[in-house]
């Protein structure tokens, strides 16, 4: 069967949930026995989000091949249970970079390079490069209809319908239908104007997905269908839900997957959603609960820790407990108030990050967790801070620090990696202080050897694993490993050549583990990551002791 394309646009305002809608539709199609792939087109000019402020963009999601991508790719991977790559996220910056590179190379034979056809052709090439024999390709266009940056992308997908045939392309438009509590009614005018804007570009949506606080009644759906020139049965409610994992079931109950199958002439198959029903039953009927303190500096924007948040929820599902998340600003933690700040936390997690702001608060929180036998999980910078804390307070190296925060220090147990072996390219990578910031870290999936008899081994159940990385600083193994091991630190995960330390533990602690990689990027609701599963288990045991 020829690949069918579903393009998902958004109107009225941003952050409506296009990514979750696309992921949920993909999950429904897979539940019907289809194969599916998915892509995010981002109109911003950045080549990728790797150097963007988390407060502006949210989390940077890393794929196996080392691509720094939009956080929506995390939703895609979790819902579709697939591994994506660089080709699944394309930005305006990358599009223009590719076109300019071709122009400099002479590929356009001296022609005038223009938005149409050169930019739009590059976008179309990116879209057509996504499917690899899958039945369906879902393409989400970031931003909002009407944004000037998004116009080339909308023009490109308009052209694709003519080129691929209307029977192979479906347009879904997600829009807002606000509910006015004071009047007790919903308003359709924003949706009408959004569709009008989209149609003025030449795109006539086939399905309208209406985000709303309340279920839309038949009269409202009929009105939207009339004014937006779509079939009545092509208007669906995307009602707010308590858990994002209810969305596939909500869309199924609306009949969205059935309508898509009819419009694209997909094979009629039953939709097996048993795993999603079981997941939601566990979320709604926990046997207990636990509270995790997340100590970071981006706590005012939860999107900065999106995959982390979800991975902790997955760990709760695996243990059939509700996970309450308490975000604690590391800049506000001091030795005097740390007990108060972390009171009631059954486990403490310090996530990744960059820069020295709030680092001492993280180290203080780690010391509290270690000394009071509170389960601790450190990720990336969190592991580095754990090593610094252990070196200072157990090994007695009071000046222990990171080269990132104290470049001239003599006791930097964490240092800038200037050389490492890339197992994918079979080449040695080299970096220095003057290297560009963008795309120069140790990125993507790397192998790791897990040491037997450790908590890491108990979690994974195997000695060889692959995990995703995003860092440029590393444990200074050559200079400090022997001293730290003698002081009781366990190096429980190493790179295959044993040059890099990937996991550390404290042996005389119920559960104290730090990892240099980002395990949250390989967790999904049906299969919690082993480390998150065991961290939540240890936190529950701490609560119940």
Swiss-Prot record:
Locate the region Amidoligase domain: 1-266
Q: PROSITE patterns of this UniProt entry?
A: GATASE_TYPE_1
UniProt-listed CDD domains: CTPS_N, GATase1_CTP_Synthase
Binding positions (L-glutamine) = 353, 381-384, 404, 472
Q: Please, which domain of life does this record's source organism belong to?
A: Bacteria
Task: Spell out the note in the miscellaneous section.
Answer: CTPSs have evolved a hybrid strategy for distinguishing between UTP and CTP. The overlapping regions of the product feedback inhibitory and substrate sites recognize a common feature in both compounds, the triphosphate moiety. To differentiate isosteric substrate and product pyrimidine rings, an additional pocket far from the expected kinase/ligase catalytic site, specifically recognizes the cytosine and ribose portions of the product inhibitor.
Instruction: Return the protein name.
Output: CTP synthase
């Amino acid at each position: 069967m020829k690949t069918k394309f579903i393009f998902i646009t958004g109107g009225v305002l941003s952050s409506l949930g296009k990514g979750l809608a696309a992921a949920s539709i993909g999950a429904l199609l897979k539940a019907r026995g289809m194969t599916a792939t998915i892509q995010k087109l981002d109109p911003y000019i950045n080549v990728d989000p790797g150097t963007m402020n988390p407060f502006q963009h949210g989390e940077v999601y890393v794929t196996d091949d080392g691509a720094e991508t939009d956080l929506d790719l995390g939703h895609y991977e979790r819902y579709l249970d697939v591994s994506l790559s660089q080709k699944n996220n394309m930005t305006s910056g990358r599009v223009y970079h590719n076109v300019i590179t071709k122009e400099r190379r002479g590929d356009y034979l001296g022609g005038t390079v223009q938005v149409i056809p050169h930019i739009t052709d590059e976008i179309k090439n990116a879209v057509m490069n996504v499917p690899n024999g899958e039945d369906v390709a879902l393409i989400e266009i970031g931003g909002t209809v009407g944004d000037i940056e998004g116009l080339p992308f909308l023009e490109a997908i308009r052209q694709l319908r003519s080129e691929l045939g209307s029977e192979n392309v479906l347009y879904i438009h997600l829009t807002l239908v606000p509910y006015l509590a004071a009047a007790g009614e919903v308003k359709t005018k924003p949706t009408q104007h959004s569709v009008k804007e989209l149609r003025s570009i030449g795109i006539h949506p086939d399905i309208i997905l209406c985000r709303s606080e309340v279920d839309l009644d038949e009269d409202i759906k009929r009105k939207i269908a009339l004014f937006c020139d779509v079939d009545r049965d092509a208007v669906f409610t995307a009602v707010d839900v308590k858990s994002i994992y209810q969305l596939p079931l909500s869309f199924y109950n609306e009949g969205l997957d059935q309508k898509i199958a009819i419009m694209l002439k997909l094979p009629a198959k039953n939709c097996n959603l048993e795993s999603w029903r079981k997941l939601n039953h566990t979320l709604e009927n926990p046997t207990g609960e636990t509270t995790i303190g997340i100590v970071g500096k981006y706590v005012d924007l939860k999107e900065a820790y999106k995959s982390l948040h979800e991975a902790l929820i997955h760990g709760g599902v695996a243990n059939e407990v509700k996970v309450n998340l308490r975000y604690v600003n590391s800049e506000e933690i001091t030795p005097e108030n740390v007990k108060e700040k972390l009171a009631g936390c059954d486990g403490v997690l310090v996530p990744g990050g960059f820069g020295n702001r709030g680092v001492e608060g993280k180290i203080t929180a780690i010391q509290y967790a270690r000394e009071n036998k509170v389960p601790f999980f450190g990720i990336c910078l969190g592991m580095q801070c754990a090593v610094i804390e252990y070196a200072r307070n157990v090994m007695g190296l009071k000046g222990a620090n990171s080269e990132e925060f104290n470049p001239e220090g003599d006791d930097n147990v964490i240092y800038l990696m200037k050389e490492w072996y890339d197992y994918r390219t079979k080449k040695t990578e080299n970096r220095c202080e003057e290297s560009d910031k963008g795309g120069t870290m140790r990125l993507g999936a790397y192998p790791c050897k897990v040491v037997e008899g450790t908590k890491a081994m108990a979690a994974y159940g195997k000695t060889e694993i692959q995990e995703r990385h995003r860092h440029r600083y590393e444990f200074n193994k050559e200079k400090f490993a022997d001293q730290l091991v003698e002081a009781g630190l366990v190096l429980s995960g190493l790179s295959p050549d044993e040059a890099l330390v990937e996991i550390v533990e404290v042996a005389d602690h119920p559960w104290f583990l730090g990892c240099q990689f980002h395990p949250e990027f390989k967790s999904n609701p049906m299969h919690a990551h082993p480390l998150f599963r065991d961290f939540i288990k240890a936190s529950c045991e701490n609560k119940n002791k």
